[in-house]
């Protein structure tokens, strides 16, 4: 009985530790210590304004938060668009397309494969049409071929692929998983 009791405790501890480790790894896929905010509309009247007023965010709002909230170390705006076809040769898909800034990759743990890179400040300054592909979007569009340096059509606009995200575990998302985004 003592042997079986000891074995049962060890098995339960091993299961619990393995579950904790796997859960931590999958939460890491979304990002660590992050807060995600969405625009919306008001639910209460205020100062003569009615219910249902749109509340939107601007880049100035992000700059104000980073200045006034000392525990916030980084902010990335994110603009998401759905239902825009993305094409490479005869392959077409409609992933979530996310407009971001360079710090986004660090915040959300979006790491490019070794032969590519992430968006940088020069891309923003020069308004370059560059894209990072989620690993499953890359596989759908290019198969096993290298995607970096190739041109994909986003709608009717050409974008140069500068990186492909390394595969990661991500069990939660707020619009789509990173593997299915551009």
Predicted segment positions?
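Mid-to-C-terminal secondary-structure elements
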Residues: 98, 102-118, 128-182
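Short, solvent-exposed loop/helix junctions and linker helices
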Residues: 6, 13, 55-59, 127
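Residues at or immediately flanking beta-strands
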Residues: 1-3, 10, 34-36, 74-76, ...
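Hydrophobic, regular-secondary-structure patches
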Residues: 17-96, 103-107, 121-122, 139-140
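Short, strongly hydrophobic transmembrane alpha-helices
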Residues: 1-21
């Amino acid at each position: 009985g003592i042997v079986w009791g000891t074995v049962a405790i060890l098995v339960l501890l091993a299961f619990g530790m393995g579950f904790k480790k796997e859960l931590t790894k999958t939460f890491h896929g979304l990002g660590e210590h992050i807060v995600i905010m969405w625009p919306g509309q008001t639910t209460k009247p205020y100062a003569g304004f009615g219910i249902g007023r749109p509340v939107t965010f601007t880049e100035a709002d992000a700059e104000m938060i980073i200045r006034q909230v000392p525990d916030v170390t980084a902010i990335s705006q994110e603009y998401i668009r759905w239902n825009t076809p993305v094409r490479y040769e005869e392959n077409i898909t409609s992933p979530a397309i996310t407009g971001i800034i360079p710090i986004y990759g660090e915040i959300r743990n979006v790491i490019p494969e070794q032969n590519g890179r992430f968006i940088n400040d020069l891309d923003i300054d020069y308004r370059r049409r560059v894209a990072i592909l989620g690993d499953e979007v890359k596989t759908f569009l290019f198969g096993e071929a290298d995607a970096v340096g190739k041109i994909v059509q986003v709608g009717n606009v050409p974008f140069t692929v500068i990186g492909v995200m390394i595969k990661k575990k991500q069990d939660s998302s707020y619009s789509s998983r990173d593997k299915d985004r551009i």
